[in-house]
Amino acid sequence: MDQELMDFFDFSKEFVRKQAPRGHVSSNVHAFVTESDELEKPIKREIVGKDYVKSFVEKEKKRMNGIFSSDEMASRRNKSLDDMDSDEEYEASPEIRTDAEFYEKYYFNLNRDKSLPIYAKREEIINAINENPVVIVKGETGCGKTTQVPPILFWMMVSKAKQYCNIVVTQPRRIAAISIANRVCQERQWQPGTVCGYQVGLHRQLERFADTRLLYCTTGVLLNILVNNKTLTHYTHIVLDEVHERGQEMDFLLIVIRRLLATNSRHVKVILMSATINPRELSDYFANESSAPPVIAASYGRNFTVEKYYRDQLQSINWEGHQEDINSPGITQEGYRSAIKTILVIDNMERNERGTGKSYNQSLREGSILIFLPGVGEINNMSDMLKDMANHDPIMKFNMVRCHSLMTSEDQREIFQPSPPGYRKIIMATNVAESSITVPDVSYIIDFCLEKVLVTDTSTNFSSLRLAWASKTNCRQRAGRVGRLRNGRVYRMVTKSFYQRELSEYSVPEMLRSPLQNCVLKAKELKMGTPVEMLALALSPPNLSDICNTILMLKEVGALFPTMDGTYDPRDGDITYWGTIMSKLPLDTHLSRLIILGYVFNLVDEAIIIAAGLTVRGIYIDSARLGADNYWMHYVFADGSGSDLVGIWRVYLTYLNMCENGLQKDASIQWAKRFHLSLRALSEMHLLVQDLRLRCEKLSLLPLNFPTHRISDDREKAIMLKVIIAGSFYPNYFVQSKSTSGDDRNMFSVISGLDPCRTVYFTSFTDRTMGELYTRKVKQLFPEAQIPPENMDVTFGQGSEKIFVTFKNDIYKPEGTTYVHVPGRIKAEVYKALRLRTYCNQHSLRVMEPMNALKYVKDKKIGKIVEGRWIPPSKPVAVELLALPSLFDKIIIGRITNIVSCGKFFFQPESFENCIANMSEHFNNPQQLQNCVRNAGAITKGLMLLAKRQGKYQRATVVRVDTQDSRNVRFYVRFVDYGDIERLPMAQLRLMSQDLLRHYRDLPPRLFECRLALVQPASMVSTYNAWPQKADDMLHALAKGGRVQLEIYSLVQNVAAVMIHLREGNLNELLVKEKLARRTDEDYMSRVDHDFRMRKQECRGYVSQQERQQVNEEYLRSKQLPQDMDLSPPPPEECNSLITLKGPFSTLESRVFSTMRSGMSKTVRIDPCSVNFVLLDTEPQDQHAKMVVAASISAAGRHNDVLTLRSTSIMPNIPGFAAIMTLIFCPRAQLKANTANSRYVSILAGIGYHPQTMQSYYEDHDLVINLDVNIDEHDVLLINQIRYMIDSAFFNLEGELHPTAGHADRVLIHNTIYPALNRLLSKNRNFIECNPNSSDYVWQDMEESGEPDPQPYGRRSIFPMHTIPELHEEKMDTVLDLIANCKEMYDYRNFEGSFDPMTCSLCKQYLESVAELRLHLLTQLHLDREKEVGYPID
């Protein structure tokens, strides 16, 4: 590495600004500011069409016209590339090469399958190939073209003196390439991998690959070979099968073949084959001025008839409703009903044809019906309607089968199984059944003539699955599914005139509706013209604006440099080494970027697995339909990460472990069923992982295998995985926001002050219904979520229409249950309950009429009736006996008796020492210890007894029975006065006498629960949001020292938030200093209580002891939570009234908002199949913006105004994480300062702007991060160092093929990036006020605000250094104004008169009341700002 550059990043040296050379893009035009409402308007884009095509096509035609002279049309054959000495030799006519040794080595039986229609065309095909460079074969499915045409070529070459022959045949799908190659070998009696073999990806048969003369491969394999070799001359014949599918790879392959035919490969023969090809279009594409490729047609000639009917011909079904609209494709309810009527017509028709006279329910219903529907949603709708009809009419006997691309192997086998006698098999299928699956017993087809097409907006990269009318080609393909074994009928659910006049003949090619990144990269690799020039030569050229947008995206992901030969070009850019890698990986560019960053951060294998999992669809089985248990498996594998991508990685590791352990097939199937996984998809994923590993090995993308560079710690790996995920899917950044409007007060007021992390609620309950009678019924609303009733408390809002369900905070789970980690502090049961709402958002509850209920409780003597109002029974609480800290006590001294973590420990005030000693003496009296437990059945959950603790018996309650060892039964007990839980044998338990029970059963615990206040675990050292062991050890060491001094911050739900005093400072601050914790706000309830306690303690000296005691008892009484008495419900026969509850809901439910310009005004949702579909505020007390990253985004809605995020990941809850990730991984960024130029307040990121016009190059993908914590100049220096190191890993000089960095350099890069990143993410940052501005999305001239940093790699830098604007101290008069404003707020703190709303100038927050002002003064934001301006704090 350059020492000067390393010195630049040495932070031990003083940072001195120097005049540095300008970057390759400079700007000197003044910035402009747009109005804020301008940001809400859609971005105006210029759509440039296909006018650019004409000049390039004419030029190519001239090149094509010179391909073949009369002399070169002789039947002379090709020689191999190895025989050529130079490029100039390509133009010469090749010498004839024989291969007699090869033909003698293998058996060639080339005169078979004469019955196939293609055989009759053999001579015609041979003559056409001899006389033309390109031949088109159009043959119906089943005519034999795929398996017979290549052997015909062999026969032709054998007859020509056994000339050399090397044939390659492409297939659009890998399974087809493999199966057809094996079938040809079987037919010709060749050993697989010799004469005939296959290659899919990098996987190929290696038996005798040198002898392979007939290679079946995927389209992508041949395309890569040709792009790398830049010639066709490795082959004598190239056969492109299924050309009609018109995928991007096929269309670009046609471009490459036509160009190479016209330049250096004029003697190679090309055969294009398809069943539904447009021969005229292809013939014109390869034609020159003197000739055009001939078309040879081979028809199949069916033995059975296929009758076609249209909607207007089906008089018997009486279809009502509107006519079809070409602009509004879809299926109405009447359309579904008409399909069902058609099924009934088919049944009646079959009965009549057989003339059996059988009744409807006796009909055999032999022929299956195949219904073509556009998507899984429509399949579900059709299935539901058929089920409803079958339920209402038992004689309707249907055997319904689904068929779509995500179905499991078991579901696929079901398609081919015969139905039970008397049942009609109805297959509801998407277009996957057009060609991929043939079901022999299908006699009828119902075709809605619809399909779903994935279309991508190249300007935003948002994809949308659009409903569209199918082409006539598709419809004919569907009709071809019948008439093979018997006569068939096709019912098209459109009118005949609509079909004939409105439906297009062919589908829209993929190149016109999908991203073009891979095509552009192939064009750059091919080096035969610019991307615009090459794509202009496509069979269906894309719009110029789509190509330009693709160029911008490739610049954004690092595949292209911003400039071309040193100059910015909106239509081109020099390819980077990243782009070279991306062109060689069969992945989306963002997934390739994931692997590249995985290499940088030494997580390449994890990145490969995730990339493969995102490429292979359907790993989880139809999670939207199988219920909560299936969905919960996402959480099992995500393991608290909040990331679908981490879940994929863990699924694969589990699958791999299962395979390595040799699990039997049946056991594997059971494992997959249990976790709702598709073995077929996992197997496909495994093949892709192996392929990617091999490709990465060839590209030298290998992990560092030294122990010091391997990330072994799961916590560190989890953070780094999130880092590379954020880097890979830039700019798909979203900010999480609370759904509850207003401040934190609403979060608690809606649920009556209960814990939002454990509580859900239902609405639409009637207060007069006496809800406490139905608590058990409410608990039974969660069976599908598998939440046991004993694990929840049900309470009711006084005077409201809500039912609250609070899940118990017990760390001990019932036996047989698996603990599943979820993000943050929230209970897993909350996620389970909320997921239920997606399946059913209304729940019925049968209750009694109010008057009958009143009489019922009166007769049963349940509770009390006061003035006609029922008071439910409750357990009295003697608040004067509670050990909770008094309202007037700020400091309490005592002992910590038990520590679960820094977030949960138990404290025993020293004032109870004598009480504890007396109790212990009483309990350990020999007379009290005589009640030994002789029968384990006498010990039940919740029973109070005596249990041995540290040699003495203390009172305890039974938590649960440990039944693992039936011979030696043990019990988990909780020591009431110490807080710890122990597993004890029966011999160490004693039953309490009646005298002891009378005295101590109702005595509250002589301790209280605590947690550390104003801090939370630091994400960099925390797993599952748990406190790190080192922090817990520090607390343990403090507890062992004896008495400790607590400062009570607040008391909420009987848990005290405390600071633990040390000789200097307190433990809370020490944990922050040691980076084991970070500062955080307390939640609303805690701040309210703290404010109340402070004000009461301030006036303590003015209140008498008796009054203080009275106030404290009222205070403690108000702190007691509502009780669930678990009353028995009334008899069902008396519950005649029905209430429909809505929910459950949570006050922590969140929404996400886009940071991208193009997503600002759109509604954002998360995919229902994502682990984050139920998105909650996992740290409700934390006011920092939390970041969500999506691997892909789809758009829906009438104006594509609803975005759905797929494969999402919640980023670590680290303040400033979004800003740091943006600055590290964006192409360019501007840091914007506040008006005083004292701090950075926002980041604008994108690929940059035009230096003269100041217009953004890629406005749609510009994103803004508004800062809520301090990012300073030294942070940006660290970020620049990381960017430089990433660039260094891949930097290569112009013209070089490989990076210049060697192994030692890579070790240095790794050892530099990790510490720098750790410093950035673990830094304790001050909170700052938000400063949103109307010019946030406006690029500005930064020349006057700071010098640009040097660009070490100049224009060959993917991550150029960020300019660091110089900051200044705030002016003194501004500081004095802020101090005055702060003092004024403190003066108002105890004000009780009329209050005029005011603004906190430090935090830019509007305060409407004194109560709001008091709570604001307690926030970390305000406290940090006070320190910043030097406000004196008492």
Swiss-Prot record:
Residues 126-295 form the Helicase ATP-binding domain. The keyword Cytoplasm applies. Its EC number is 3.6.4.13. It comes from the Eukaryota. Keywords: ATP-binding, Cytoplasm, Developmental protein, Differentiation, Helicase, Hydrolase, Meiosis, Nucleotide-binding, Oogenesis, RNA-mediated gene silencing, Spermatogenesis. Residues 356-527 form the Helicase C-terminal domain. Disulfide bonds: none annotated. SMART domains: DEXDc, HA2, HELICc, TUDOR. GO terms for cellular component: nucleus; P granule. The keyword ATP-binding applies. GO terms for biological process: dorsal appendage formation; germarium-derived oocyte fate determination; global gene silencing by mRNA cleavage; heterochromatin formation; intracellular mRNA localization; mitotic chromosome condensation; oocyte karyosome formation; oocyte localization involved in germarium-derived egg chamber formation. It catalyses: ATP + H2O = ADP + phosphate + H(+). One of its GO terms (molecular function) is ATP hydrolysis activity. It is found in: Cytoplasm. SUPFAM superfamilies: P-loop containing nucleoside triphosphate hydrolases (SSF52540), Tudor/PWWP/MBT (SSF63748). A motif (DEAH box) lies at residues 241-244. Residues 936-999 form the Tudor domain. InterPro entries: DEAD/DEAH_box_helicase_dom, Helicase-assoc_dom, Helicase_ATP-bd, Helicase_C-like, P-loop_NTPase, SNase_OB-fold_sf, Tudor, Znf_C2H2_type. Coiled coil: none annotated. ATP binds at G139, E140, T141, G142, C143, G144, K145, T146. Probable ATP-binding RNA helicase which plays a central role during spermatogenesis and oogenesis by repressing transposable elements and preventing their mobilization, which is essential for the germline integrity. Acts via the piRNA metabolic process, which mediates the repression of transposable elements during meiosis by forming complexes composed of piRNAs and Piwi and govern the methylation and subsequent repression of transposons. Involved in the repression of LTR retrotransposon copia. Belongs to the DEAD box helicase family. DEAH subfamily. This is Probable ATP-dependent RNA helicase spindle-E. The lineage of its organism: Eukaryota, Metazoa, Ecdysozoa, Arthropoda, Hexapoda. The gene is spn-E.
